[in-house]
Amino acid sequence: MSNFLKPNTLHVDSLSPRHRSLSSGLSSGLSSACSSGSVSPVPIIPIIAISRIRDGDESESESEIELEPARIFHRRMSINNSGNNKRSTNLASIIKEGYLLKHTWSFQRWRRRYFRLKRNHLYYAKDAKCDVFDEIDLSELCYFECSIKNVNHSFQIITPTRSVVLCADSRRDMEDWLGSLKAATAPQRPRGDSILIDQHDILSNHHHWYATSHARPTYCNVCRDALSGVTSHGLSCEVCKCKVHKRCAAKAIANCKWTTLATVGKDIIEQPDGSIIMPHQWMEGNLPVSSICAVCKKTCGSVLRLQDWRCLWCRDTVHVACRPQMAIACPIGPAKLSVVPPTSVHSISTDDAWDVASPKGNFSPLLVFVNSKSGDNQGVKFLRRFKQLLNPAQVFDLISTGPSLGLRLFRHFEMFRILVCSGDGSVGWVLSEIDRFNMHKQCQVAVMPLGTGNDLARVLGWGSSCDDDTHLPQILERYESASTKMLDRWSIMVFEKAISVPKIPKMSITTEQEAVLTGMVTAANQHLRLIVETNDTQTLISSTRNLCDTIDDLVSRIFEHHKDDEQLAVKCDILKQKLTMLLDALQEEEIGAHSGDDLIATIRSLIARSVPSTNSARPSLLNPNISIEKTEKDHINLKERRSSRSLRSSEKEALQCRANSVKRAIYNVVEHSEPGRPKRYQRKLSITPFEALKIPTNSGESTPCSSPLPIIPPINIISPTMETSRLTCISPLPDTRRDSVDENFFNSINLPAPRQFADSRRSSGVPEVIQELEEGANGETIYRIGRLSLSGGANIDDAGNRLSPVSDGGDNSPIDRKLDFLRVPIITSDSIVDPLSDYRPIEVFERTYYMARELDKDKDKERKQDVVLDGEKEEDAGVNEKCEEQTLHPQNTLVHTCNLQVPGIVVTPQSQNVYTSDSITIIDTDQQSNTLQEQSSSEELGCDASDVLSAISNEECSVASEIFDKAETGHTLGDIIQNLDASNFTHIDSPETSDETEAMPGESLMDDISSVLGHDITNALQDNTITDDTTTLCSEHMGPPKPPRKKSMSALSKSQIHPRRRNSSPPRMARLARMDSDDNPQQFGFENIVFEIDNRCDDQKMREPPRYCSLAQFVEGNDIARQSFKQLMLECNSNNNSNNNSNSNSNNNNHNDGNSNDEPETPTNTVITLAHSQLTTTSTSDELDELSTQTAIKIEIHDADSSTMCTTTATTKPLESAMASSTSPTKRSGLGQDISVVVRPPTPLRGDSIKPTPSSSSILSSSLLGVRSLNSSEIRRHSSHAPSLAVREYDKDKDRRHSGFNPNYLALDPEHARFLSSSPAASRRISCGSLFKKNQKYYTKRTYGLFRVRFFVVAEPDIRLATLALIRPLIPLPNEALPNLQTLKGSKSSLFMGSTLFGFEHFSDKEERQGKDKERTPPEETSRKMPIINPIVRLPNWPNLANGTGFISKCLLANADTLCAAVSPLMDPDETLLAGYHEKCVMNNYFGIGIDAKISLDFHNKREEHPEKCRSRARNYMWYGVLGSKQLLQKTCKNLEQRVQLECDGQRIPLPELQGIVILNIPSFMGGTNFWGSSTKKDDIFLPPSFDDRVLEVVAVFGSVQMAASRLINLQHHRIAQCQSVQINILGDEEIPIQVDGEAWLQPPGMIRILHKNRVQMLCRNRSLEVSLKSWQEKQRQHSISIQRDASSTASEHAVSTDDVISERECYVLLNFIEAVSSLVKWVKFLIISHPALQHDLYEVACRASEALESIHPQGKLLEGPSLRTKLVEVIDSSRQLYDDACTLLRDRGHSLILREDLETKLSAALANMEMELKKCSVQKCIDGKLRAYFNVLAPNEESDGRRKSRPFWVRLRSGSTAGQQQFKPPMTNTREAANNWSVNEVVTWLETMQLSEYVDSFLKNDIRGKELLTLGRRDLKDLGVVKVGHVKRILQAIKDLSEN
């Protein structure tokens, strides 16, 4: 038998071409014979037997027993005898392969077979190693989904010769195979894109079969025979319901439901005007039960044969005989509003979107996405049902095509709706794709609940489930009447320690161009890494050569496809330029240029070589007088430093910066080349994400300053990789990146750091030439060039000697350049080469190019300004010389120098605003003068040289920081730029903490502080005082401390002849004296100087204190250890110097004496008084009186170590007396020590959000910021912390400080900037008022806590706010100490105008804020500020509280705002950037971490492992219950509070013992649980939850029992807060489960930030509108029934009478018509007779109408019979002409007519009656061709004419009030402009024309004019007495028509 079978096994590959064609021809011939069904069964029987003997499982079965006569010609393919090359070719052409179950004939079994799919062929064998495969020809393929023996993933393949049933492991696999079969049989196209395949499937018009059974006899639409079997089993098209046999499926023609105009084909009907009519699409037979013919209204359809027709669109059924009488146009059906007619979709344009022509009438297309897996695979039913109701091209399966195809096709629709039929996860998928296509404004999204949870559908009102598809048309009507609401969407930003490389999808289709670009980018990255890391010369040379070749090839390939893109050409040029810079740097390094020369020389040589040598060299961008010289001392210092290892590191850093710059340029070029598909490009480049190159160093070489400024890549491509070390504390402010040296943690991970925590050494790569900018007296900018020491910052000349203060005017004085304020020039024409031009980013060149032409103009003005400035400096020199004698301790030290151009810093010879005594220093930074020349530099600076600093902060900077081995010794007073936030209570590594300080006992002080303030307040103190250590950068050799510098208080009384400008730099004497100081912040390295400069290029930076970097001691579970804090030793002289104010000083001395005599051992009081006055004698006495009587603050600071009292006052007598009478010595016993006030300034706002206030009062009210206890009790009098305080008149658009942009910070994208500007800052504000009253002067005295800080307030409201600003961040005040802030919003010159401390809405005008407020916050939120924190959260026994009815609970609720606002600030959104973060996903519903996410993750894993167990919603709920009970026992998320940290709007929330945290955007969680509690009850603390208020609700989860109980009862004790941003820090090494909208995963340690992303329009169910529409439709139906009844009665009357007899009703209307015509004819004739000047044509028309009227009642009797209707036509025509001519005459000549009053009244009434009667008449053309007149008998009868005659008609024709000036208009003027000018009478006439005269009295009584008419609403009409729904709708519709027209 085996020998007999061998000839039947055809080895196709071994046959010759001739035999191969013969075999195929034989097979095709027999195939055609088989398809005809006429093959005799005689030869088949032995063949079947042979087949069974040959292979027992080769006989397939079907539901119908059908024989396969072509079985003998089954082809088999051998794959081994063709050679390896042939086999590789065959494998390459495989589309899909894998194992499937094949249904066999014997015993209905399933056998596992290996299948291979190629083009038009399918092969299968037992396994992949078989040599021979069976072949199935797919040339005429029919495939469909089926279900056999309860197998839900089976599908059947039918060809003319084979019928095979296959089964996949899952539905996804089945759909993959079906999609592959579709691709294998689709015609080949030049672009093998999946989009084209999907589009072809839409446009092909093919049927989509599935196997089904039928309860009624059903007939095949191909062969017209009945389907076999009792159940009529066969195939049905899921779209058009075409029925066929399985054997006939391949023969069915492609006439499925139309999708586009092309598929309509020859059935297109075009009207004469060119418009296309939608025709009917008929399907024959198989009509539903009880179908009624649309023409004859009789039953149609049959169960005996295939007959009658059914339209696929309007679903009308019709008989074969009645079909010609059917209307041509198809009404489309009940879902007409949602359907996209195929006649409107003309084609698919080049951007893969439909070219759409909107149809006439109402049109709101609906795009439907269905998840076929949702709802126990119920989505398949809804998918088919939607395709039957709508255009099949509107419905997409999310599993097969995803949302992108549908959104792309609908892109050209101006407005459309989206219906997502799935769960919450699929809704998020669709919304993410909407984000990607940026279609938020085009679409409105609705949800149909088919998933398990369906939380979003619940909230939107669509219910919790939808399982029945039979009522889908009614459901669509609900979605058509839905209302729109905005849904907030939140970005889940994640910063992880290790981010894995994303996997490439299995079925990803990549183009050749993308693959080539990816390979080139990868190769370039490898070459760059080798260049930076290698030490081998040959490797370096080869890598460099390969890099150049790769970049050249990359640029050429990209540029040839984008030849016209100018921006791409610029980016390519930048890439080539940066590559040239890298090569130059390599060349200099290799030839040894660094061996004996400084890096500046290298830069100079590089630039000199790159700049073309021309006569006019390129001008300098900074200064034309820069000179780079070397001295012998410089060379000595160079040789000393060359021996250190840091120099090599610096060279490596320079090279690394160059390499990173090239790498960034490559990514910019490639990103720009593919703007259309950014997501695909990101996926392709994900294998080589942008990552800054790092220099490999060992542990010995890793110094704190060894890394340059980090390059922060774009968020969308960053992929940092870090080691997984223990994460014990995470800095909450991801502002910049820092490199730290902690062995356990910070060496292995780079984390974002806040600005106050940021490492100053990050700015080590700084250009060494920095320019000083100073302002002239009249608003000009002056450039100064000074030599600054790299060690201490002193001024040094070229020879290395320090400059004296009087050297400004000498030969060594810097050359001053003045710049016009408006022009801000940067570039000069001098032939000086800028040494930093190549190191400055291209953006700086672009930004300053157009500023370069005006530098050398106005030379005379510059010289005059120099003379004025020099005179000023000479007068200041004397004071500086005196200071120098007292404080300067020069030392001959070798100092490396270079030219430094410091932007925004002016080094002046004298600081006249610094006043020093033995124990206190007062610094006045806001001295004002009456002279016109005085202006603040922070307010006049037109260009703050941010361009220079942008170069510093850019990766282009490669100059390393210089750190000296020798340190200066000495201890003097700190320079004036001091830390405002620091106090005696400072960090152990802070620069303020010198070696003289004594360490506090670790437990005593901190325990006391923690016990009083709590953990969070202690954290606030830590955050306010932590600075970063720079002592590690210094030498270990320290000199002996020196006593502090002294300055006489007599400086207070000295007059200032010339005003001094406020500077951002300390006075020169302070710098020189500070150089030898031990606590000098500048001695720790040049990088700290530049870091200070870098952070102070604008006004905000000038006000902010310097932050030097250090490492604190950390302990697990806390931010910082207690050992990291010390107590500064205050040094106060026992002698009190005399003050200018004798009375105040004497009073204070009395207190001091009392303290020192009575209690020598008790702490003394340090009384500091600040007043809003100038501490000079230049101010007039009037000004002093005015200032001193308004405001003052007195603060007592107790210090245990100080032995005397230090006092400074500047107030007048009324204030002094008040202070003296209220101040008394405070006695205290014990050993405790008082801590001085640590001032936390308010968070600054962006400058452009504050309106400048030129008011003079701003000068007075903005001069106080804070008080600080310095090393010598230094007090700074400062204007403000906010950039815009006391802003004077200037053009703020020309000052970049007020644009909110700072080039030195990391890039702040516009979207994030808008978020920061719209959301309240995370300031410590008080949201509710208290007991202070407006404008009430009184005096308060309070002592709070352990600090014993006393605040004396004698002031107006502004100074009370100032007091609160000082104490607000530290002390939780009771309500009585807080003023009523809502009453203080009137003062625009308030001290806190630019601050967000109290949320005063920035004191801007209401008109400017109105639009933003409406978009940003709802009205309820105006009185409450975020975050709103539950006051019970900080109770130690939370959540184990009572019912909340006790006294403590009531007190907590009463002081909720005060307690909530006192939480320690940890994160300020205004200062936070997202560098290092990437968007993990987007949250729409809720976010969970802990137990809830663990349950969701376990359920997800269970569903993946056993999908058959999770196919129904009931089973899924059961599994959730089981898994929740499991967590009740296991408690895997126990002690979650130890593993995570929670921050709400920057405020740390103390967490109790809990197992999870849930963040809600909607009030529904995990299947309907209301975790937040009842939202209907009014809450005194929280806002009602809503999904459109941009507010999140944070809830604690204590266990699975609480989760279960929340489904039944409303729990509220677990509420944490309401806020606008959330940050969660995950500590430790373990991953924590996290879920977003039900999708769970394990999140590694790191930081998670939840920020507002955008808003999307969602459709919510509107039940009230549904009820109204339903009632209206019912009335319309009743009305149509009555009309039909009347029409039938009229028809019966017509049938009874052979002639058209006038009915009784029509006769009544006819008599009224005759009366109206007669009256009009009469009064028109009288008008013409009375005014002979008028035209006589009107009289002829009146006579003609009168004659026609007489013809219908000759001799006083009406005509009878059909002649009456014919005669009436003439009467109607003549009367209408008379009416029109009369109105035209009155309109044209009315202004000159003077009519009698009675004639005017009667004529107007006649015209009005005629108009109403003409509306009741109609003329119709009958079958015989004659015209006949008919009357509308259903129109309501009018009231008597008396009322109408009392109101003249043509009042509505006039626009004026006087008759002589009236201008007539048409009777019915429907334009909005005309209606707006209507009078009451015209409105009444308008009502009468609508036959609503019963409301005339009401409109007259309420004086409703046209303007009021256009604004009437439903409620207004109800008040006017219009209660009938029909009348209300008619009036509203008419008003709408008036408005639209």
Curated annotation (Swiss-Prot):
Catalytic activity: a 1,2-diacyl-sn-glycerol + ATP = a 1,2-diacyl-sn-glycero-3-phosphate + ADP + H(+)
Protein EC: 2.7.1.107
Sequence ranges assigned to domain DAGKc in this UniProt record: 361-497
Zinc finger (Phorbol-ester/DAG-type) boundaries: 206-256, 279-330
Domain PH: 93-186
One GO-annotated biological process of the protein: phospholipase C-activating G protein-coupled receptor signaling pathway
PROSITE patterns the record matches: DAGK (PS50146), PH_DOMAIN (PS50003), SAM_DOMAIN (PS50105), ZF_DAG_PE_1 (PS00479), ZF_DAG_PE_2 (PS50081)
CC terms in the record's Gene Ontology section: cytoplasm; plasma membrane
Location(s) in or outside the cell: Cytoplasm
GO molecular function: ATP binding; ATP-dependent diacylglycerol kinase activity; zinc ion binding
Pfam families: C1_1, DAGK_acc, DAGK_cat, DGKD_4H, PH, SAM_1
Domain SAM stretches: 1878-1941
Region feature (Disordered): 1030-1068, 1132-1164, 1215-1257, 1276-1295
Record field: compositional bias (Low complexity): 1133-1155
Protein keywords: ATP-binding, Cytoplasm, Kinase, Metal-binding, Nucleotide-binding, Phosphoprotein, Repeat, Transferase, Zinc, Zinc-finger
Family (UniProt): Belongs to the eukaryotic diacylglycerol kinase family.
Function of the protein: Phosphorylates diacylglycerol (DAG) to generate phosphatidic acid (PA).
Protein name: Diacylglycerol kinase eta
